[in-house]
Structure formats: structure tokens, C-alpha cells
Design a protein with these regions (language model features):
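Extracytoplasmic "Venus flytrap"
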Residues: 33-54, 148-153
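Conserved C-terminal helix/tail region of periplasmic/extracytoplasmic solute-binding proteins
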Residues: 338-401
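Short, polar/charged alpha-helical segment
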Residues: 42-75, 105-107, 158-162
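Pocket-lining segment of extracytoplasmic ligand-binding domains
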Residues: 188-298
């Protein structure tokens, strides 16, 4: 474990052991304590590094009239530890993919999503170069490497459901092998026929000649594809039209910044300050360009710098240039939660709207503090990523399963 002053990183379980339970109201303290769990190996890592380098959180807090903040960014390579810290009150903030976020929102005391810190991963389905697997039909009876119960597992289930009309992978003869480390995705593994991977690891594996891509999360085929649509990369698989979130993806990937509900109620200005800092980091890095983003976050990411550059150009905050939650973003959680092979309890539309609405005031305050960017009309712009009314208009949202 290594610490870097008060704003440095601590890692995993050691970080949780070092933290007190959150019980003291900042009203009785000169500076507001903020414990923020992050996954540096994902795209939020670059935003966090920029916030630290430029002291964006401290500056935003001062602008909002806070006496001061004491941020502690804590790196969690294992998501379970972060979830445990949030549930126990040892972390006030966390970064979650949609799969753990849905599970967290169905609890009795849910977290509140307040910003988008990433998304857009293409989750390639890959095989060794000499594999007889060329399409989804060929995957029947085979073994797939993934992380069971994760976003990767969710992508595989939704691919197969669109193609075959069932979420039951066992009924299709597909066996799952649970990986121990992300590095396993960069090459063929003994006893495994295919990897449901993620980028940048998959890009690096393909460039090294270790794996080839059949299909991506956006419905586009890879170089190894052979099927009714033709051969090679860049085709759209026919069954992709059956997925509810086309044309974006089988799984419209998002990474959410979430906050404990009690902390949000007690510290709205501190939450607003973090959102302001995050948006300023997004704006600065987007303007700086891909090379600067990779330079900022590369040390914590997998794959080669060249693969990271290709990956960053797909990241949602890089493409949008802003981090606000929209009605369309929220609707993806409601829709995805109906995937029974992954989730035991669906996220009810009205319950979801009420949870998101808890962050409406702080989101609007952060939007105004950062110059009201983008213009309101941008939210209604028809793009490949689902948009819609911003979260400060959540009272008028119409979420549907």
C-alpha cells in the first residue's frame, strides 16, 4: 500500500481499514471529508489524475463557499471491496459499471448516480487465430472466458438473446470460465474457446496476433467473422436489430459516479464541488486530445499506449465532452435490469426516476457553475448514444422497462 499525502491513492482492503465510519456531520468540522472509490484501470482514472494534478476539487469547493475539503481518492482493483466500503459508510463515493449499479439501486438504501465517468466499451468476442469459431452459432457447446455476473457476462447474454431468443447460455451448451485477472484476456487460455473481452486489452491482443475478433458490443463484426452477412470486419450482424438499445449497443456501457444518499443529503455543496471538478477535467482532457488523455492515465491502464489511444476515442465522456446524466442514460439501467440471467430484481421505472431525482439539484448547480455546457438543445440531439432530458428535469422523465 502506498499513500501520497492527503490526496494520494490507497489500495483495496487496506484503504477501507484506514477509513473511519462516516458518522460525523461536516457541519461540525472545518473541512469536509470526502472518501472516493475509483477504478484507475478504467477511463475514470484519467479524470481522477487530472483532478488531483490541478486541485480541481479543492478549487471548486472554494468557489462554492465551503471552508475546505479533504479528498481521499482510493484505488480499488477489486470491485467487491468498493461496494463493501460504500455499503458500510466507509466510502461516500464510488465508480460503478451498470451491472453493479443496478444491483446497488435495488437495495433498501440505494446510492444515487450523479455523473457519467465512462462508457462505450466495445467488449469484443475474441478467439485464437486458428479457431473454427466464426459466428455466434459456432459458439454453441463452447467455453467462454469472462467475469461471471459482470458487465462482460451481461454483454454475452444479450448477444445470445438477440441471436437465439434465450438468455439461458446452458441451454445453448455454452460454458462459462471465470477469469482471475484481466491479463488473461490478452491471449488464448488452456481449455477456453473464446474470450468475452474489453478494450484496450482486446485491441492489444489483436495487434499482437494472439486473438482475433468475431463480434463487438455495437453489433459490428470483426475480421474473423463469417456468416450470412458476409465475411470480415465492419458488417452489422442481422440479429443486432433485435436488441432494444440498437443502434448503440447490446449493452449501452456506462460507468457511473455514485454517492451515498445520506452523504448527499448532508453535504450537497461537497457533492456539487466533485461534479464541477469532474466536468472541468472532462472538458480539459477532451480539448487536450487523445494523446494527452493517454499520457495522463496510461500508467494505470492495460494494453499498449497505441491500443489505449484507440480505446479512448470510444469513451463516452471523450465523445460527448460532458458528464451529465440524461433520461436515456437512466433508461438503460431500467431496461438492462430485466435481464433475468444476470439480475434477480428488476429496477422499477418509477423507483429509478425518484432515485435519480435526488441528484437533480446538485447536478443543476454543477451545470450552471461550469458555464451551462453543453447548450440545452444538445441533450435532445439524436446520436448513437441515448440522450434525452438532463437529470435536473427528472421530474418529467418517463422511464420504461
Amino acid at each position: 500500500m502506498k499513500t501520497f499525502a492527503r490526496r494520494g491513492f490507497m489500495t483495496g482492503a487496506a484503504a477501507l481499514l484506514a477509513l473511519p465510519m462516516f458518522r460525523i456531520s461536516p457541519a461540525f468540522a472545518q473541512a469536509v471529508k470526502m472518501s472516493i472509490g475509483v477504478g484507475l484501470a478504467q477511463e475514470p482514472g484519467a479524470l481522477v489524475v487530472r483532478m488531483q494534478q490541478e486541485k480541481l476539487l479543492e478549487k471548486a469547493a472554494q468557489e462554492l463557499g465551503l471552508a475546505g475539503v479533504e479528498p481521499e481518492f482510493l484505488h480499488f482493483p477489486v470491485l467487491l471491496r468498493m461496494l463493501q466500503g460504500i455499503a458500510a459508510g466507509q466510502l461516500q463515493f464510488g465508480t460503478l459499471g451498470s451491472t453493479p449499479c443496478i444491483r446497488a439501486l435495488t437495495l433498501s438504501d440505494p446510492v444515487v448516480p450523479i455523473a457519467i465517468l465512462g462508457g462505450g466499451n466495445t467488449f469484443p468476442l475474441q478467439v485464437p487465430p486458428n479457431s473454427p469459431i466464426h459466428n455466434l452459432d459456432d459458439l454453441k457447446g463452447k467455453t467462454v472466458l469472462t467475469i461471471v455476473g459482470s458487465d462482460l457476462h451481461l454483454v454475452l447474454v444479450r448477444m445470445m438473446n438477440a441471436q437465439f431468443g434465450t438468455e439461458d447460455l446452458k441451454a445453448l451448451g455454452i460454458n462459462l470460465r471465470n477469469m482471475n485477472a484481466l491479463t488473461e484476456l490478452t491471449r488464448a487460455q488452456p481449455g477456453v474457446d473464446a474470450n468475452l473481452s474489453l478494450i484496450p486489452q482486446a485491441i492489444a491482443a489483436e495487434r499482437a496476433g494472439d486473438l482475433v475478433t468475431i463480434l463487438r458490443n455495437d453489433g459490428k463484426t470483426g475480421a474473423a467473422y463469417q456468416g450470412p452477412e458476409g465475411k470480415g470486419a465492419g458488417l452489422t450482424i442481422a440479429s443486432f436489430a433485435k436488441t432494444p438499445f440498437a443502434p448503440e449497443a447490446y449493452y449501452p456501457h456506462r460507468i457511473w459516479l455514485v454517492v451515498r444518499r445520506d452523504y448527499l443529503a448532508a453535504n450537497p455543496k461537497a457533492v456539487t464541488a466533485l461534479m464541477v471538478a469532474n466536468q472541468r477535467a472532462v472538458s480539459a482532457l477532451t480539448k487536450a486530445g487523445t494523446d494527452e488523455i493517454v499520457k495522463t492515465g496510461s500508467a494505470n491502464w492495460g494494453g499498449t499506449p497505441e491500443a489505449q489511444k484507440d480505446w479512448i476515442d470510444t469513451v463516452l465522456w471523450k465523445r460527448r465532452g460532458w458528464s451529465w446524466i440524461t433520461e436515456g442514460d437512466a433508461s438503460t439501467l431500467v431496461g438492462l435490469s430485466t435481464t433475468k440471467a444476470i439480475f434477480q430484481t428488476p429496477l422499477e421505472p418509477d423507483a429509478a426516476r425518484k432515485i435519480f431525482a435526488m441528484g437533480a439539484d446538485v447536478s443543476k448547480a454543477a451545470y450552471e457553475a461550469t458555464g451551462r455546457f453543453p447548450e440545452r438543445t444538445v441533450f435532445d440531439d439524436s446520436r448513437s448514444d441515448v440522450r434525452g432530458r438532463p437529470v435536473w428535469e427528472a421530474a418529467s422523465w418517463n422511464l420504461k422497462a
